[in-house]
Amino acid sequence: MVREPVKIQGTKEGLVIVVDEDVDIEVLKERIVDRIEKSLKFFEGATLNVRVKNSKFKDEELEDLKDFILKNYGVEIFIKKFQEKHIKNVTDDEIFNGLEEGITKFHRGTVRSGQVVKYYGNLVIIGDVNPGGLVQAAGNIVVTGTLRGIAHAGFTGNKEAFIVASSLKAMQLRIANIISRAPDKEEEVEYPEIAVVRKNKIIVRPLYHLSDLW
């Protein structure tokens, strides 16, 4: 089997590009650009970890690479050395499992009808999600305002993910492959709520009742 000099791996830190020894800086640049251009919406406003065990890269080469990616794609890159044994290789479908901690994207502003915000980590919406808006996260979803659209947490299959909103009025809730909708309420509630999976069903509880859930 031919060894892949530039590998895309998933860790609890999120998406990581692992660079083997003797990789040319231009090859690294091409692979990063190729990956970003295939998933522009995913990388929007995100950060990318690049782990290298190649000491021949000059500092100015790495800085030029970081500046190029940030300027042209708006993606911030963090580069550091690594020891390969510390990186766990997983499949793309398992790319994010860190629910207690891990990479988090903050989306500022209202998610409007027809708009999709998707992230392979935890997702925080600083604003509302309007009817017809869709937010998706491999991890947890937190909406600081009113959630009226569709929220899909743990979309890679993680049933431990949760959805929190200051006002939960969702058209539909999804956690992993389980689908539900926010329950109809006889009267408006004035407290945040959390949706979790219990016994293979999505349940919604007041956020202050966390002790009943865990």
UniProtKB/Swiss-Prot annotation:
Family per similarity comment: Belongs to the MinC family.
Source organism (scientific name): Caldanaerobacter subterraneus subsp. tengcongensis (strain DSM 15242 / JCM 11007 / NBRC 100824 / MB4) (Thermoanaerobacter tengcongensis)
KW Cell division (keyword) present: yes
Assembly notes: Interacts with MinD and FtsZ.
Xref: Gene3D superfamilies: 2.160.20.70, 3.30.160.540
GO biological process: cell morphogenesis; division septum assembly; regulation of cell division; regulation of cell septum assembly
Described purpose of this protein according to its UniProt entry: Cell division inhibitor that blocks the formation of polar Z ring septums. Rapidly oscillates between the poles of the cell to destabilize FtsZ filaments that have formed before they mature into polar Z rings. Prevents FtsZ polymerization.
InterPro entries listed in its UniProt record: CAP/MinC_C, MinC, MinC_C_sf, MinC_N, Septum_form_inhib_MinC_C
Cleaved signal peptide residues: none
Keywords carried by this UniProt record: Cell cycle, Cell division, Septation
HAMAP family from the UniProt entry: MinC
Protein name stated in the entry: Probable septum site-determining protein MinC
Domain of life where this protein originates: Bacteria
Record keyword Protein biosynthesis present: no
Alphabetized PANTHER family for the sequence: SEPTUM SITE-DETERMINING PROTEIN MINC
